[in-house]
Amino acid sequence: MWLSTFLALLIFVECVIVVYIPAYIESKLSKIKKNRFFNMENFENIASGAILALAFLHMLPEVIILSNKKNMNLYYIFILVLVSVTFLNITDILYDHHFESTFDVNCTLACENSNNQIKNINDKEITTNYIDIKSNEVIDLELKAMDTNINNNNNNNNNNKTDPCKTNIFFEIFKSNSFFIVLSLFIHSFIEGLLMGSLKDKNAIIIVGLSMLAHKWAECLIVYKNVVNKIENPLLASIYAWSFILSLPLGVFIAIFSFPSNEFVEIIFSSIACGFFLYLSFNMTKEIKITKSNKHFISFSYFLGVGGMSTLMILFNSFESNNII
């Protein structure tokens, strides 16, 4: 019991650090000269590769082994994976469409009109054959007045036209796919906690706990990328983040006191989580801008994540098979 509790505490600390530290690191990196390798793009790229390896070498084999024990057809597993990938694609497309449709066209038109007015004033100034100090002062006053009016109009528009998504927390929940990602990760981590808490052999507990410590950081970066860094409502972002952070320790404590892991439930949600991981592995890289100077670093960081996580998973799988540590 104490060993499972200690490992659950370590995983809890790891999750808190990896979910919240990247925002601090990103703000620090933005203030210094950008390094071609040590930047958030490459760190996220490493996480993307690690998530891909995690899906293929940890989740999918685990689900296949459990399904064979339950005499389930593998087609059901792959259907669940395919449905989860398709579902996330649809919700992500809807989120992008909503984001584009909320673009403030009126503000853009006001800025264009102000630029045209400034251009007309400058044209009048150029066509004048003489330079009068008083006329220049008048033009300056007109420009300042225009800027003041534009700022006031923008402030009024921002005050009067509040985004309903920001004021309605229930609409914010289903505005993007963050809810479904966190729900899947919560259930997956909760089941992992049930598994670790229901183990009795110390060697098995250590192997499973260290394996979770080795790969949990990749899941935390998913939460950072898709929740902490994406959701505008800070209260909702905190609820999502802490739900994920507490999911594994909660599963451990419940398993210790009463409720063991259920293999059928584990098959379903591990299959869904596997599909989510496959999708997110490629989705996290879609905003990366590849240039001539960084293309080699982008490729290297991705395969570093794949190779590093693959090595860790193969190592811990061999420990599990041999039951040694």
UniProtKB/Swiss-Prot annotation:
Intracellular or extracellular location(s): Cytoplasmic vesicle membrane
Q: What is the predominant subcellular site recorded for this chain?
A: membrane
Write out the GO biological process terms. Answer: zinc ion transmembrane transport
Annotated membrane topology is: Multi-pass membrane protein
- Record field: transmembrane: 5-25, 46-66, 74-94, 179-199, 239-259, 264-284, 296-316
Q: Which residues are glycosylated?
A: 106, 160
Induction annotation? Expression is modulated by the levels of iron ions in the environment.
In Pfam terms, one family for this protein is: Zip
Explain the consequences of disrupting this gene.
Answer: Targeted gene disruption results in increased growth rates of blood stage parasites.
Extract the GO molecular function terms from the UniProt entry: zinc ion transmembrane transporter activity
Keyword vocabulary terms for this entry:
Cytoplasmic vesicle, Glycoprotein, Ion transport, Iron, Iron transport, Membrane, Transmembrane, Transmembrane helix, Transport
Q: Which PANTHER family match?
A: METAL HOMEOSTASIS FACTOR ATX2, ZINC/IRON TRANSPORTER
Described by its record, this protein's role is as follows: Putative transporter for the divalent zinc and iron cations.
Question: Which named protein is this?
Answer: Putative metal ion transporter ZIPCO
Origin species: Plasmodium falciparum (isolate 3D7)
